[in-house]
UniProtKB/Swiss-Prot annotation:
HAMAP family, sorted: GlmM_B (MF_01554_B)
Residues reported to bind Mg(2+): S100, D240, D242, D244
Organism: Bacillus cereus (strain ATCC 10987 / NRS 248)
A Pfam short name: PGM_PMM_IV
Name of this protein: Phosphoglucosamine mutase
Active site: S100 (phosphoserine intermediate)
Family, as annotated: Belongs to the phosphohexose mutase family.
Amino acid sequence: MGKYFGTDGVRGVANQELTPELAFKIGRFGGYVLTKDTDRPKVIIGRDTRISGHMLEGALVAGLLSTGAEVMRLGVISTPGVAYLTKALDAQAGVMISASHNPVQDNGIKFFGSDGFKLTDEQEAEIEALLDKEVDELPRPTGTNLGQVSDYFEGGQKYLQYIKQTVEEDFSGLHIALDCAHGATSSLAPYLFADLEADISTMGTSPNGMNINDGVGSTHPEVLAELVKEKGADIGLAFDGDGDRLIAVDEKGNIVDGDQIMFICAKYMKETGQLKHNTVVSTVMSNLGFYKALEANGITSDKTAVGDRYVMEEMKRGGYNLGGEQSGHIILLDYITTGDGMLSALQLVNIMKMTKKPLSELAGEMTKFPQLLVNVRVTDKKLALENEKIKEIIRVVEEEMNGDGRILVRPSGTEPLIRVMAEAPTQEVCDAYVHRIVEVVKAEVGAE
């Protein structure tokens, strides 16, 4: 990771860390790096529903126009919608303004190349080098060589029509509950599932600029679980603020996470001859039960560092078509070049239809190990990982586990947090291991 770019683009508190001034420079320098070999390049921009989205969009657009790029605004749309449309509209670059599942005060900027994939480390390093220069030496076109801006608010519908044709039949006879996190999928997901003839109940579909991810969405699926039980729905689908994650709820109100969704997809794709190289790519955060279920079904797995960009890199390297994270980023590379909550939801409901099995039965074929993840706010992520007392308590706990479970201590890619995770045969043992490590992390480098 660089000085500005984290695991998922540039993030920060809007108007303090991620200022309009910085957004202008990111637009100008990012636009230049991605379009310098093209005459009159086209760049598309989407955003989620945050109040700061308009401010940052205006600054980004100005930066891009100053390089001579033509800018097309998509309005409110999901991150995978931008990824798809970048390639579908033959744009040289796509930009999404969002901080995903983060709270409303945060925002972020992430770029997609002309192929719809996130930027390489080399491209990000080139943009960062320009950001750090004291003098802006890039060309400044004038007159008719300046870029112009236009709106293409139909982009969301074009994207929905594309993902809709990935399923084999409609969803008539199913009652689907949706939680759109007051975010980018708020108008898209209800339209999509109603268009497929499902009965729908919705929540989190009234964005006001301030309520994105606030007690709703994929980070709060327990709220959707109540709606599923109240309405007697067959399935609940919870998206995050920018629509690149999915967490589901079965008909009994049980939460079905990204590991379980990946397993369900992998098993079905193997049975139907669609799973390339019989392999799923996941991260080190995936549950032990996920790997045991894959093994029992003759499916191999490939592990990466945490972050959907690392999953994607491994998928491209190995020629795999299914990967993702426990947090609900599911990548279906046959169809789209990033994690996609609505596409994953379509595939999950399609599997229910084709197998004629309820979600509880499909998810029940994987038994999760008890797991606990605690986030500790720290003063310095790097210092935490080098701290001798923290390293010692991790070693002691791992020895006590004796191979019956695991510990993972890692920094967040986007926030000043250390994540402490354990899996063990019982919840009680799991909790005890985590809290012992958390206490040492707090004592040594805690920010509170």
